[in-house]
Amino acid sequence: MDIQRVKRLLSITNDKHDEYLTEMVPLLVEFAKDECHNPFIDKDGNESIPSGVLIFVAKAAQFYMTNAGLTGRSMDTVSYNFATEIPSTILKKLNPYRKMAR
């Protein structure tokens, strides 16, 4: 999956996150394949990632690269809490593509 496509989906117009996305996007695609028990291979043997999975990858990358996972913040003595797991609102994008595990 091309990181430029992920950048377009997230409206990222600079190169600030390119290194991160180059590493993270393939990991998230692999996560989606494992989670769905689906290799996303078409009849010709080429990888074919459905649009919902593309959205999952983009949103999950955004979640991990920004403070989108911020769950709490204190002002006195400064304290931040972050969620470390992908939220169910993002994970549910994979539901239509899940197959039963064999």
Curated annotation (Swiss-Prot):
Keywords: Viral genome ejection through host cell envelope, Viral long flexible tail ejection system, Viral penetration into host cytoplasm, Virion, Virus entry into host cell
GO terms for biological process, alphabetical: symbiont genome ejection through host cell envelope, long flexible tail mechanism
Domain of life: Viruses
Record field: transmembrane: none
Gene Ontology cellular component list: virion component
Presence of the UniProt keyword Cell membrane in the record: no
Entry's localization field: Virion
Gene3D superfamilies for this protein: 1.10.246.150
Pfam families in the cross-refs: Phage_connect_1
Functional summary from the UniProt entry: Head completion protein that exhibits an open central channel for viral DNA ejection. Part of the head-tail connector by binding to the portal protein and to the head completion protein 16.
UniProt family annotation: Belongs to the Caudoviricetes gp6/gp15 head completion protein family.
Subunit and partners: Homododecamer. Interacts with the stopper protein gp16. Interacts with the portal protein; this interaction occurs at the end of the packaging when the terminase complex is replaced by the connector.
Protein's name according to its UniProt entry: Head completion protein gp15
Organism: Bacillus phage SPP1 (Bacteriophage SPP1)
Lineage, uppermost ranks: Viruses, Duplodnaviria, Heunggongvirae, Uroviricota, Caudoviricetes
